[in-house]
């Protein structure tokens, strides 16, 4: 599986490995999660 780059939308409930950085964090303004 390809990982998502920084700033990409990710699932807050998904595995951290979905992001290349290994961190999926809440967006400060939008009510979404993004890769750190």
UniProtKB/Swiss-Prot annotation:
Database matches in InterPro entries: Tryp_inh
The family this protein is said to belong to: Belongs to the Mirabilis serine proteinase inhibitor family.
Domain of life: Eukaryota
Sites annotated Reactive bond for trypsin: 31-32
MF terms in GO: serine-type endopeptidase inhibitor activity
Keyword Nuclease among record annotations: no
Pfam family, one: Tryp_inh
Keyword annotations from UniProtKB, A to Z: Disulfide bond, Knottin, Protease inhibitor, Serine protease inhibitor
UniProt note: domains: The presence of a 'disulfide through disulfide knot' structurally defines this protein as a knottin.
Disulphide bond pairs: 3-20, 10-24, 19-35
Free-text function comment from the UniProt entry: Trypsin inhibitor.
UniProt protein name: Trypsin inhibitor 2
């Amino acid at each position: 599986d390809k990982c998502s780059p920084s700033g990409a939308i990710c699932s807050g409930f998904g595995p951290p490995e979905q992001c290349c950085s290994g961190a999926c964090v809440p967006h400060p303004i939008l009510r979404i999660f993004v890769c750190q």
